[in-house]
Amino acid sequence: MASESSPLLAYRLLGEEGAAFPPNGAGVSGVPSSRKLSTFLGVVVPTVLSMFSIVVFLRIGFVVGHAGLLQALAMLLVAYIILALTVLSVCAIATNGAVRGGGAYFMISRTLGPEVGGSIGLMFYLANVCGCAVSLLGLVESILDVFGADATGSSGIQVLPQGYGWNLLYGSLLLGLVGGVCTLGAGLYARASFLTFLLVSGSLASVLVSFVAVGPRNIPLAPRPGTNASSVPHRHGHFTGFNGSTLRDNLGAGYAEDYTTGAMMTFASVFAVLFNGCTGIMAGANMSGELKDPSRAIPLGTIIAVAYTFFIYILLFFLSSFTCDRALLQEDYGFFRDISLWPPLVLIGIYATALSASMSSLIGASRILHALAQDDLFGVILAPAKVVSGGGNPWGAVLYSWGLVQLVLLAGKLNTLAAVVTVFYLVAYAAVDLSCLSLEWASAPNFRPTFSLFSWHTCLLGVASCLLMMFLISPGAAGGSLLLMGLLSALLTARGGPSSWGYVSQALLFHQVRKYLLRLDVRKEHVKFWRPQLLLLVGNPRGALPLLRLANQLKKGGLYVLGHVTLGDLDSLPSDPVQPQYGAWLSLVDLAQVKAFVDLTLSPSVRQGAQHLLRISGLGGMKPNTLVLGFYDDAPPQDHFLTDPAFSEPAEGTREGGSPALSTLFPPPRAPGSPRALSPQDYVATVADALKMNKNVVLARACGALPPERLSRGSSSSAQLHHVDVWPLNLLRPRGGPGYVDVCGLFLLQMATILSMVPAWHSARLRIFLCLGPREAPGAAEGRLRALLSQLRIRAEVQEVVWGEGAETGEPEEEEGDFVNGGRGDEEAEALACSANALVRAQQGRGTVGGPGGPEGRDGEEGPTTALTFLYLPRPPADPARYPRYLALLETLSRDLGPTLLIHGVTPVTCTDL
């Protein structure tokens, strides 16, 4: 539990020796700080190189040639709108607090929780793994175009053998080079990336100059794979220079077969390839653990990189459309080299871009994997990824990722992987947008990012656009990715994860609950929609576990509050003793599997504490209308924690994770004869207080004897037939007459019916006992009662019971303390209570009837079949001096009846209208 002194942010200024910690928690005990990268080297450079990847050199012609300039621009605009929406969300989350290693995974998991964050983090990791393989395959393709045995053109040095096995070998060798750089750490990676950035920038500059400086030329096209070069006439593509007719020819779409795969291209397939090249916006965020100031570097560097790459793509699209015919664009994806003033510089750019993109994907994947392993979401399967070097470099995660990339290289074809990689990236982007949307909708005061150029509209549009594009690109891959995410989330939920990160779902639920509680108007309540809202007062849950579960069954979709009064005076205590108890009571609710709130209070007496809880428990229109108490008798309390399987604890007294066992958090049951916290006088006074507050009252006796199968959560499969007996008559003031079922009697019928609707009680039969006066003819009253039950839609058996000469007739009286103040003496009341008890026991099969004024019973009944008995609870007497006598009569009335509920209802709860 957080205290007043608990910080809102875990941020330490000084270490143990007084040395200042690095910002954002960079310093880790025993591990040197690895936060060395600036905004430019840590975010701008890797993001630009990842967003260019091989697309900028090898797929510009592919996109423009198949889609045409207009559709290519539309694709680029759509792609960058999606990216921009996600970038806004990334910037908002990154500027709302300290960002540690793991990048997008860290943001998602700390917002949506470990289940969703872990599943999407693993998928984003796989997307980076596949992205690394795609970049390497593109690099192999570009190398073989020049140096392969089947390469065409006079500039080709045809020394490298080709084929699936050779291509796999080349990719594996390049992967070894990339993995070696990443294994040596982020510092070497940053220097290599900067060198690569310079090479790529120089290469792109030479290409842009070549579009203007080179004159028209014919460029020979290589024969398609699988064709005999000698039997196919030589074909040429044309570089026309800036030409208006070339631009007009390239404006519209011209989808054809991809000469590398033979597959027919469509808008979706071309967009997948283009978008895959633009999906590197998280490259900088993935390096969050190595950035000096990630909260500033991530938003600033990402925005700069996105704007720069968008401008370069637009420029290349226009230049290609103005100068190259469609045949050249569609049949020679590496035409930049053919039109360059110095072709080797383009080759250097291609190789450098592909290498840098693969390095960025591999090192980003390793950081995500290391963060997943540190959070221990997937157990020992990711244990090797926790290994770090002395400088904090997670080389174990790098080697782990290297092995997975090697497996992906077996797929072989660049465009084959593009759709899957794109869909996985889109899932991660949608999750980032959803995280920001959730934080914005939750309206939590601590969500106040310094980056404010976003709103819930941009977040929602980002989520929708990502999901739409997923299914547009590949419906199968999109459906499979969502299914995979669901399975991983279910796995993590079943396994359990850290709960200290915070769940935005809790903030969203609070926001929605508050909104609807304000709309829940008590002035609009109607008896048709009445439901029980219970406040169960418990002294020690060890002895009240069956009652705890029975009350959970009685609530029927209503409110259930578990209340407890701690005796004490806050003025004489150094701190509030109630707050530390909440955790134990919430654990009790979880283990007992009941749907209850917990409300604790501190009071000098139990009676005053009960008054507090009756007045202040609940909120708005959700406040208790019924008080439930255990019965006050001399029976020794039982410790149900010892016999209930849900509460069985390890021998050492600790639960999983090292937390104290629940059995150690509650005191042992009260020993027989020991003093009680509540006197008989205060017990009856508490009942009287509840009735004065217009609350219904339920007193539960002997609930520990309930059949265990009736307290289970599922349907009961008990072979024994059980009854639920209802006596809707004040047995301490017997009377006949046509109107004896009053408000309290109807409340009994309602509560018994509610219990019969619970699956565990479906097989139990509801019996209602109709008490007849000595001069009342049988049949007539039963007919009236059956008509009433029919109107109330209550299915039950009706059994007539004839009282002796002591029964009264007439309408029920509303006099408080009816039987006590009704003129009967104590001896007569005691005799009547004994007679009523014998009557009920006889109908249960617990014994035969005897005594004056007793009913006609059934002798020789075999064993009790009644699982639970509902009895009418009379009002307490008006004179507090008679409270002990009242309690003694209740004890006599309910003695040896087994599980019994004595109920007094004060509010109408039934309705016969539609």
From Swiss-Prot:
Disordered as annotated region, ranges: 645-678, 844-864
GO MF term (any one): chloride:monoatomic cation symporter activity
Main localization, broad class: membrane
Keywords: Cell membrane, Glycoprotein, Lysosome, Membrane, Phosphoprotein, Transmembrane, Transmembrane helix, Transport
Pfam families assigned: AA_permease, SLC12
Modified sites of kind Phosphoserine: S6
Extracellular compartment segments: 58-72, 141-167, 215-262, 319-338, 400-416, 488-740
Transmembrane segments: 37-57, 73-93, 120-140, 168-188, 194-214, 263-283, 298-318, 339-359, 377-399, 417-437, 467-487, 741-761
One GO process term, biological-process aspect: inorganic cation transmembrane transport
InterPro entries: AA-permease/SLC12A_dom, SLC12_C, SLC12A_fam
Topology with respect to the bilayer: Multi-pass membrane protein
Cellular compartment(s): Cell membrane; Lysosome membrane
Signal peptide: none
Family of this protein: Belongs to the SLC12A transporter family.
Known function: May be an inhibitor of SLC12A1. Seems to correspond to a subunit of a multimeric transport system and thus, additional subunits may be required for its function. May play a role in lysosomal ion flux and osmoregulation.
UniProt-recorded name of the protein: Solute carrier family 12 member 9
Organism: Mus musculus (Mouse)
Organism placement in taxonomy: Eukaryota, Metazoa, Chordata, Craniata, Vertebrata
